[in-house]
Curated annotation (Swiss-Prot):
Keywords: Cell cycle, Cell division, Chromosome partition, Cytoplasm. It comes from the Bacteria. The lineage of its organism: Bacteria, Bacillati, Mycoplasmatota, Mycoplasmoidales, Mycoplasmoidaceae. One of its GO terms (biological process) is chromosome separation. This is Segregation and condensation protein B. It comes from Mycoplasma pneumoniae (strain ATCC 29342 / M129 / Subtype 1) (Mycoplasmoides pneumoniae). The keyword Metal-binding does not apply. Its main location: cytoplasm.
Length: 208
């Protein structure tokens, strides 16, 4: 007679209704999503039958938990429409030491200039951009569209019916802000620094 005892592993049931499990699930999902992060809509698609209100409440709970935990170097930050896990500013010096070369702005100075013009004047057309710059911006606008940093809103009802542009959610992610209100005020705006990417670095890593 075969005396082998077959051990059956218990089946763990998912408890979508459990607030603790929901917080843990969101934490894990944000972790694996990396720099891309996740929007509420994406979380809602993955966490089926949970509902947006419960997801929002769990996000707030997780955000508060990480924020108040002095032993955690991670927090949740919203970039445009996406939520991401990022390192806290309190440990930025250690991060800099580990990664001595900061992530550099992937945009050149002319592209930064056009992007700044659109951000501060949106909705904005190519003729308006050219007028402000005093130079043609056709190729740069196309590059920004290709990089998905701006989007077309349609055409303006003026002669020539030029396209209208505004910044995209990816713009907010790149500069580490939630809204245009977080951009430097116009009276304090330094276009040269914006061109050089200083604004990009300061918002990603804090002032040195």
């Amino acid at each position: 007679m075969d005396a082998t005892i077959k051990v059956t592993k218990p089946v763990l049931k998912q408890k979508d209704s459990s607030a603790a499990n929901l917080v843990a699930a969101i934490y894990g999902l944000l972790f694996v999503s990396g720099e891309k992060g996740l929007t509420l809509a994406e979380l809602n698609r993955v966490l089926r039958k949970v509902g947006l209100e419960k997801i929002k409440a769990a996000l707030v709970q997780l955000e508060r938990k990480l924020s108040l935990d002095d032993e955690s170097g991670i927090e949740i930050k919203k970039f445009g429409h996406s939520f991401r896990l990022v390192t806290k500013m309190e440990i930025k010096d250690f991060i800099h030491r580990y990664l001595p070369n900061k992530i550099k702005n992937p945009l050149n100075s002319k592209t930064m200039e056009v992007l700044a013009i659109i951000a501060y004047n949106q909705p904005c057309t190519r003729p308006r951009i050219n007028e402000i710059r005093g130079a043609d911006s056709f190729q740069i606008v196309d590059d920004l569209l290709e990089k998905e940093l701006i989007v077309e809103l349609g055409r303006k009802d003026t002669p020539g019916r030029p396209f209208i542009y505004e910044v995209s959610p990816k713009f907010y992610d790149l500069f580490g802000i939630n809204s245009l209100d977080e951009l430097p005020k116009v009276e304090n705006f330094d276009l040269d620094k914006f061109r050089q990417g200083s604004f990009f670095d300061s918002n990603r890593y804090g002032d040195d």
